[in-house]
Every structure is written in structure tokens, then in C-alpha cells.
Amino acid sequence: DYLFVIGFSLGGKYDNIVIEKMAKSAANLASGELLQFEHISNLSTTPENYYSIVDGKTAGVFASACSCAGIIAGANSDVIKSLENFGIELGRAFQLVDDLLDLTGDTSMGKPKGTDVHEGKMTLPLIHSFTILHGIEREQLADILNNFSDDRWQELTTLLVKSGSFEYVKQLIMNHIDRALNHLDLLPESNAKNLMKDIAIASQNRRL
């Protein structure tokens, strides 16, 4: 919330279109938060539901920041759209990395392991695993998610490995980063473009 207040104070110096984009981003963030709340502990959550949440929150904020930067820099509409798409793909990848870190990371990353699982958030690794598994294993996963505690980590990890969910999400991350980098092709060569490439690649490799 604080960062949005600061953002609006800075954005107020620019054209109305920048303020409108920031306002839309804030509204979508709130909508995404509400949608995520609706899907807490909801084992029927689909990948489409997941991406709707992410696009409203993380990816939407990234896209707004990137497109506003283009507008302020005086870029043409094609470049602005490319920057927006870069932000969307980068934001999706960033969130997927965050999902994996919640299941495999450590406290040194600034987020305790298992925060999302404890809160009942249906992240994509969990959604994928629940879709792939069948019979007893699917029932076991449902029981773990509905009655999660730290002593069930090994059970959960075993099922996620068996369903290939870790590798599936890692591949999706690579796909989103590749698409993000492709959206930069329209931009002229510059230090800024190289920095954006570096940021995209670095976000993909956060302690995975």
C-alpha cells in the first residue's frame, strides 16, 4: 500500500494516461486479491483461475510499471505494448518462482518456507499436482492440503515430485522468461535494454 501511495505521488507529475494506468493497476490488484481469497483452500482451482489472480496482482503491477516507463520516455505505441507484454511475462515468471520457493526455499530468501501452503493458497505446483494425481494419491494430497502441518512436508514433497509438478513449473518459468525476452526485440539496443534482460534472467534463477 505504501509503495502505491509513493507511486501515485510520483505518477501525478506525468500525463493523465500514466495516472489512469496506475489507478487501473491498483484496482486490478484489489480484484486479484479478492479472487485469490475466493480460492483459498479450493481444490477445484484451475490454472486459468491461477493466472487470473497473478495477472491481476504480480504480473499486472509489473506490466503497468514497464508500460508507464515507456510512456514517460516518449516511446511509440508499439514499444509501449512490447514493454507491457514484457512486464506481464516477467511478472508471471516471478510469481511462479515465488511459488516454488514457498515449497523448496529457505528463510534466507525473506519468506518462511510453506507460507502459502499454510494459508491455503492454491499455487500452480499444487494445482498441477492435484490435476495429475488420481485415486489414493489424489485423496492423500487433498488431505494434506486440507489439514496441512509442518510434519507433512515429506508427504507433500513426495507427491509433487511424483506428479512432476516441480519440473512442470520450472519449464513454465523458462517459457515466460523466453517470451519476455522476445518482447524486447522491438526495442533499440541500449544499456536499459540489456539491464531488462539481466533482470529477467536473474529473476528466473532466484535460488531454484
Question: Across the structure, where does each feature detected by a protein language model lie?
Answer:
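All-alpha prenyltransferase/terpene-synthase fold signal
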Residues: 1-208
